[in-house]
Amino acid sequence: MDRKYMIRWDAPEGFDPTSVLMSLPSPIAPGVREIYNYSVKEEGFYFVDRQVDPRTAGEALKLFIDEALKHSNEVIIENL
């Protein structure tokens, strides 16, 4: 069963997510199974943990949270 999160934060105008996206671990596990998925939205980052590889998904989730905290004093993580 997937675990879905919305990482809400106020991104600065002109925010470019390229650096965080380029630092993410591969979302594909051996056997071509998806470990996690994400999308960059106006209100923050949407993240889906496929429950395939908790270590890799956790690393990716942490990178998104750290990126939000670099640019905003308040970050809200919703478990959807």
Residue spans for each PLM region:
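Short, intrinsically disordered low-complexity segments
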Residues: 22-66
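A short amphipathic beta-strand at an alpha->beta junction
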Residues: 72-80
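Short, extreme N-terminal segment that most often corresponds to the first beta-strand
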Residues: 1-21
